[in-house]
């Protein structure tokens, strides 16, 4: 039998966002500021919800969970990217790569389920206000949250296990700023067809399920809103739904474009820009979107500031 002299790679190079040295320090500073604001704002929102009994309702229970997931995703991707802006050696080991991918896939999938859960919560609040406390009880809220995190964990675990069937023996250059799944497939020596198929089936099914849940929830909510005769009631309902609809649009927009865009070198660059948006920018925007136009959150923050001044 012929001896197989193929050397399997256990380290990779992340190309990052730019090859131009003059851009590295400005980008480092920009993303460092974004990361710090993201962490402070999301953790601050969690602390605010935790400490104010008036915010201990399902809407803010899920919002606090979303803030945690946003901080998780940002912390999974951004620190390594910041290090690579300054480091001459942008290597990442296979084990580190797998940990980063699992952590990101877990957070991203959990966020999809949380957005769908929050849409259902708004549907019940608008369409069945009298039954809201009965339907959205503590038991259901905990089960919905557990389902979201368990779904994220299992989805990430399945892809993680399937990645270990791949071998890497030619190029060790990952054209991305973090270990995402598709760039890993592109440098695999093993045929990744099964992996691509599972991404299409599992990730596609999750996105379709969560998007349909959001659309159905807000379609019924919209019809209920339009039946309201009170202008104040209509404004309040739209205000309640507006922040979540904006967050959903920002999150799913780049993902949908990535799936629909044909493969090309230009598409790879655009995919990286889209990845920056939903891994770094959206975790920054979500707490701002949900906080700035939310009277209860603003009032709670104001009371907290007055207590501590």
From Swiss-Prot:
Q: Which InterPro entries match?
A: GPCR_Rhodpsn, GPCR_Rhodpsn_7TM, Olfact_rcpt
Q: Cite the CDD domains for this sequence.
A: 7tmA_OR5H-like
Q: Has keyword Cell membrane?
A: yes
Gene encoding the protein = OR5H2
Q: Where are the transmembrane segments?
A: 29-49, 57-77, 98-118, 144-164, 194-214, 240-260, 272-292
**Keyword Iron carried by entry:** no
Q: What does this protein do?
A: Odorant receptor.
Where can this protein be found?
Cell membrane
Tell me which parts of the chain lie in the Cytoplasmic compartment.
Answer: 50-56, 119-143, 215-239, 293-309
Q: Which UniProt keywords apply?
A: Cell membrane, Disulfide bond, G-protein coupled receptor, Glycoprotein, Membrane, Olfaction, Receptor, Sensory transduction, Transducer, Transmembrane, Transmembrane helix
What is the official name of this protein in its record? Olfactory receptor 5H2
User: What terms describe the molecular function in GO for this protein?
Assistant: G protein-coupled receptor activity; odorant binding; olfactory receptor activity
Annotated disulfide bonds: 97-179
> Which family is this sequence assigned to?
Belongs to the G-protein coupled receptor 1 family.
Extracellular topological intervals: 1-28, 78-97, 165-193, 261-271
Q: Which domain of life is it from?
A: Eukaryota
Please give, as recorded in its UniProt entry, the membrane topology of this protein: Multi-pass membrane protein
Q: Which GO terms describe its cellular component?
A: plasma membrane
**What SUPFAM superfamilies does this protein's entry cite?**
Family A G protein-coupled receptor-like (SSF81321)
Sugar attachment sites: 5
